[in-house]
């Protein structure tokens, strides 16, 4: 048995990726029509051809057995923590969810142009109201209870909140907690940024501050870390 996913670019099928049961290196092959398109999505490493691409020499912890073209679409630390929380709510262990399934979980919500089908996990056909304070609190809980997620999210009333943060937080990339939102500057209303929002809304990448367990490789971020990042952003705008 294998896990198979279709890879799409701008609504067009460009190929498929598969991972055989018991193996840890995936195989990718371009769609026959796309192989003749002349659109090079990875010209240096995966030029258009009818060959099957596999990259067993790539770092397994980094690429999870995927070609670099596809691995770049995988969720990072925070996104994976959210997926693990969702798996716990489904009674599954994180290691039962392979790399191709994680691509399918990203589906069409990724930051780049690539999309993966069939989509897995909670999705929304219309925008829903989001309470940022609840997202921050839930992000802290996810990062603080990584070793006991199933018990943490078994409590009554957390399913909807978990679904909300899964819809906005798994695709943004990066190690630290963040979400893709739609914000209305006039009403200050925040909605999911994963689907088309109503008129008056703007799309933003929202970085959470004050989240417990929020870090990359070093110590946990102190409160106000986001303000420091913002200060660096302002400094970068200064022309000397």
Named regions from a protein language model:
Residues 1-238:
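Phosphate/dinucleotide-binding and metal-coordinating scaffold of catalytic cores
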């Amino acid at each position: 048995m294998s896990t198979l996913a279709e890879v799409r670019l701008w609504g067009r099928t460009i190929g498929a990726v598969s991972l055989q049961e018991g193996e840890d290196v995936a195989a990718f092959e371009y769609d026959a029509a796309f192989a003749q398109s002349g659109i090079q999505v990875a010209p240096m490493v995966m030029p258009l051809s009818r060959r099957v691409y596999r990259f067993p020499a790539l770092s397994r912890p980094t690429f999870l057995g995927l070609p670099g073209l596809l691995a770049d679409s995988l969720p990072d630390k925070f996104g994976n923590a959210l997926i693990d929380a969702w798996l716990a709510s489904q009674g599954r262990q994180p290691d039962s969810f392979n790399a191709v399934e994680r691509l399918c979980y990203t589906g069409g919500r990724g930051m780049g142009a690539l999309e993966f089908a069939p989509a897995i996990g909670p999705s929304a056909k219309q925008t829903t109201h989001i309470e940022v304070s609840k997202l921050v609190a839930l992000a802290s809980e996810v990062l603080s209870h990584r070793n006991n997620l199933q018990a943490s999210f078994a409590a009554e009333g957390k399913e909807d909140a978990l679904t909300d943060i899964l819809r906005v937080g798994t695709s943004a990339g990066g190690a630290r907690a963040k979400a893709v939102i739609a914000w209305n500057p006039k009403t200050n209303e925040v909605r999911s940024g994963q689907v088309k929002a109503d008129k008056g809304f703007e799309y933003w990448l929202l970085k959470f501050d004050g989240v417990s367990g929020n870090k990359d490789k070093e110590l946990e971020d102190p409160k106000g870390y986001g303000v420091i990042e913002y200060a660096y952003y302002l400094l970068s705008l200064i022309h000397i």
